Amino acid sequence: MARFFQPKKHSTLDTKHQPVTIERLDHQGSGLAFLHKKPLFVDGALPGEEVLIQLTENKSKYARGQLIKVLKPSAERVAPFCAHYAQCGGCDLQHLDRAGQIHHKQQALSQLMVKFAGQSLALSAPVCSDDQGYRRRARLSLMWDKKTQQLQLGFRRKQSKAIVNVTDCPVLEPSLNALLPDLNALLSEWSQPERLGHVELVKGDNTRVLVLRHLGALIEQDQQRLTDFASQNQLTLYLMLEAGELQHVQGEAPYCEETGSRLSFLPSHFIQVNRAVNQHMVAQALNWLEVSPQEHVLDLFCGLGNFTLPLAKQAQAVVGVEGVDEMVQHATHNAKLNQINNVAFYQANLEQDMTSASWAQQKFAKVLLDPARAGAEGIVDQLSALGAKRVVYVSCNPATLARDSQSLLSQGFRLEKLGMLDMFPHTSHLESMALFVKKG
């Protein structure tokens, strides 16, 4: 039978402006409406608002629309405090007041736990901080625009790879924010601007850190101007080479004083962005674990010892386990720095079976987990075998927390407490803490 060519059908996008009513926010902070019974996502729209939209995407199961005009605003709508908010992709909830942001994040956490773990629980009080000047580290992109012959220093534009030039970031720690105009001016006069990669700014308790990612060797003139800038501003300066290695140029090694312990770190190490929330988070985790002086505690995904060292002040002994060997070495250094002798750190791939590891033979009634966004798949299935009776799970991804909760519930744990940690105000990103207790 002959087969004839048939052109593919192309669905035309209706670009007329259309009014819709926003029902709620989705977990990413976009307004959710329904257009012909199909979910429609609208960035910048709030629950209860009547808005005018233009379709930008129309799939079989969902659609996306651009907010054209707010016809009937929500009482929770506020004017963004940042001049770059409309373009910058760093924040996505500045148009929603703080109470509304916190309510939305708590609601999102509750809904995910009900949907994927079948757990409904009244949330503990949220852990919050000041909503401006809270970021103690940031990575800013650098791009040389050949057409305009100008350097762009800032953050990615919303849903784009383009750079929004930023000279003021109100959520950045004030002493870091103050560097932006002069840093932009310095790098705009760079001899080879096309070789600039990115800049990282970090606020330690003893110093501010500047890291410059540069492709290829610096010429002497640029190197001198950079070191002069660091000296004038009393900065610790690092260069990041093409292989990703850090080269310390000048200044003190940075550290943070966290919950009574001094944590030395390198700019490549993970530290929590929001110092105030981190301190409250650590205190709450210790309170929920209820550690006694006779107990051995296990800290999984321990990093530099953010939880490990405070735990060691309450327990008989603490074991910290981390996947990155360099972090293990630095955590061990931090324990010595703080004269804490009842901790031991180990490197291990926590996706594998750990029950036969030497450190696992101690058995631990109390366990703390603080995994990355991928969650604790692998090790979470082994907690009952490790002797756990009480588990605090700190999560930066509620979806993987909900998934891992299913494993804990199947091992005979019950979810006793659940709370939201507002580590990143004015963004839809939420962190959370859950307490699981072994039944019986």
UniProtKB/Swiss-Prot annotation:
InterPro entries: 23S_rRNA_MeTrfase_RlmD, MeTrfase_TrmA_AS, MeTrfase_TrmA_CS, NA-bd_OB-fold, SAM-dependent_MTases_sf, TRAM_dom, U5_MeTrfase_fam. PROSITE patterns: SAM_MT_RNA_M5U, TRAM, TRMA_1, TRMA_2. CDD domains: AdoMet_MTases. It is an enzyme of class 2 (transferase). It catalyses: uridine(1939) in 23S rRNA + S-adenosyl-L-methionine = 5-methyluridine(1939) in 23S rRNA + S-adenosyl-L-homocysteine + H(+). GO terms for molecular function: 4 iron, 4 sulfur cluster binding; iron ion binding; RNA binding; rRNA (uridine-C5-)-methyltransferase activity. GO terms for biological process: rRNA base methylation. This is 23S rRNA (uracil(1939)-C(5))-methyltransferase RlmD.
